Every structure is written in C-alpha cells, then in structure tokens.
C-alpha cells in the first residue's frame, strides 16, 4: 500500500460550460488551402504586426481599442508570436487593401504578417472584419467577418485570434477552450471553470463539502469528479445539459476519474479489495476491470486514440508511472528515475506524458517523458510544490498548480517549461487544473 502522504497529496491536492461560440463567422475572402507560416531563420515565433482596429462612423473607438487589446493579449498568451507595433506610415487609408498598406515599412521592422480589422455597430449588433496580409507578397491570406452583440466582443475577438493561429500554423488554437479546477475560495473545495487565459471564472458546484479531480468528457456532455458529500470519496458524473448528477455507489472508495472517450471513463475503485482501475460507461456502470496488482493503481490518463492508458501504481514499491495496453491487456513500467512519480497527463499530440515527482528535499516538480520512456526532461525547479500538470488542447502549453508564492495557485508554461506565469488571481487556493478539449 502507498504511504498515507501519497494518498493525501493525490486526493486532497491532486462543468466546463460548453457554451457555443455566439459569434457567427462569415467568410469575406475564401481560403480553401491552409497557409503554414515559415519562421525566419533563427526565430522560434511568428513575427506579426497587429494594428489597432479601425471603426466605422457611429462606432466607439474605445470598443475598437478593446477588441485590439483582446486579440493582442490572446495571441501573446499562446507564445507563438512576436507581436510588433505598426510603423506610423503603415496605412494610407482606413480601407485595407494591398494598395493602401506600406509593406516596405512593415518589412523594415521585421514583420512577416500584418493583421488588421474594422469594427462597426448597427442596431445593437457589432461586426468585426479581420484580415491577415503576407508582408513579403502584399497578398491577403485570410479574412473573415464575425457578428454578435457588444457583450460578445471578447468571443468575437477570440474567434478571430483563433482563426489567425489556425491559419498561420495549420493547428487549432486554445481559444474557446476552458480549464476546470478546484478552489476553496467559498470556504469549501468546489469545482470552478475559467477561460483558457484565466478570465471568466465561474463556480460550477456548491456542495459545501469537498469536490475533487474534475474531468470533462471530450464531447463536453459530462463532468466526472470525486465527491465527498456522502462522507467518503465516491465517483460522481454530472450530465451538463440537465444538471443531473449520478453518484456511483460502490463499497469502499472511488477516486480520480479520467475519460477514455465521450462514453467511457476510468476510475479507481476498492470494492474488490485493492484499489484498482476500472472502465465504466458514462452512466457509471462498470464495463471492465483494467488492473490487478498488490499495490494501489490510480490516476488514469489516456492516449489520444484511447488505445493506451498511463496510470500510477505502487506495484514496484514506490509509486511509478505505468502504461496499460488495451490490445494486450498488459502493463509496462514507464518511469525508472525518481522514487515518487505521480499525476501523469498524456499529451493530446500523443508523444509525451507529463507527471509530478515528489523529491527528497520536499519539492514537487513537473517532468515530461516520451511515451517510449526516453527523453526525460524536468520543467520546474526550485519553486516549491508544482503538481497536477494538464496539457492545453493543442499540446503547446501545460497548466499546473504551484505554491511558489505561498498559497497554491494555477500557472501556465510552454510545453518545454519556458514562460512560467500565473494564470488567474482569485481568493483562496486553486489546485487540480484540467484543461478541456476544444469547445464544440
């Protein structure tokens, strides 16, 4: 059996509201083929000149400045861009075309692409027209129109930002995704959600008890979590469309659910003795026992194709990361460095697994390892307890909990450990973040 500090650390510190995008994009310029940005030699980011949005008659300039700030902050958050201020002589007209933009001036400051837009309002509706030009050729690469109400300006701006990322990189962005996490700001441990950048925090549960380890199904229909309202940890599954919560009653304890796909999830049960991993359907019915060992098995996380599952087991003595293969039904040990490896998180790209290591000096640090056991890399160091890593949907970032400034808060970093910074600032402590898949 694992020592109690491991169980306590994992369980006590281990809805997403899938609101559809209210902005409805309408193509201005057809872009049937993806354009993949080529970075300049020696550069690790895309040099993008972002201009302040223009406004039509009757539209508040402050609204355009707000939209520009939302786009700039969002693109900067991704870590993909070097954002440049436009030169003073970049435009000869508020009507954007290749003939009214000074591409030589843009090239002189190192810009590879130029993003600009127009904001207009009429009858309570606002329209954002966004365009991206290639500096080298002066050609329009991308353009779209987004409509909504003024209260939806953030969604409109992020819809444009997400399309810019997808068009220039060929990959989906984090815009529209959300993060679920645990906070005690209300006095008890409840589940909260926030946008990808820490904005729009919402409390999702109000049990006035303890809720832990939130996990959203890939289709956004269900939220699974560990529920203590009955006095012991039990699996709870909430159907988000109806708000109906099903508590799966089993003898013993249940902790730490994870979804294999939109209709199957795994969790740890102890009703047959040892704490083992089981596969369930979305209603909570057990379909299959996955592990059988003399030690505790917990913390499942699935490969993107659902064919493999990483988990934590003490079968070798101390907790280590193992990988279960559904085709063979066998498990193999993945980690051999470190005596206390926990909280695995499989990258959505499929090539790496992040996890936490409890080190002898008292620090907890986050590492990543290739799925074949090679390439062990430490991402955090000399910053207290860093735990519960969770990948962004595009695999470019990791959100995690850290007490580096005292109380545990949420932080984000790039997948290589660079640019570690706080995600949000709210009262209480925040732990156990889980980054959702793309909103649908």
UniProtKB/Swiss-Prot annotation:
What is an example of a Pfam family matching this protein?
PD40
Major place of residence: periplasm
Tagged with keyword Signal:
yes
Q: Name one GO cellular component term.
A: periplasmic space
Q: Which GO terms describe its biological process?
A: protein import
Which InterPro entries is this protein grouped with? 6-blade_b-propeller_TolB-like, PD40, Tol-Pal_TolB, TolB_N
Q: Where is the signal peptide?
A: 1-30
Question: Which cysteine pairs are covalently linked by disulfides here?
Answer: none
User: Which locations, inside or outside the cell, does it occupy?
Assistant: Periplasm
Q: Which Gene3D superfamilies match?
A: TolB, C-terminal domain, TolB, N-terminal domain
Give the UniProt keywords, A-Z.
Periplasm, Signal
PANTHER family assigned to the protein according to its UniProt record, in alphabetical order: PROTEIN TOLB, PROTEIN TOLB HOMOLOG
Family, according to the entry, reads as follows: Belongs to the TolB family.
Q: Which NCBIfam families match?
A: propeller_TolB
The name of this protein is Protein TolB homolog
Q: Which organism is it from?
A: Chlorobium chlorochromatii (strain CaD3)
As recorded in Swiss-Prot or TrEMBL, the protein's gene is named tolB
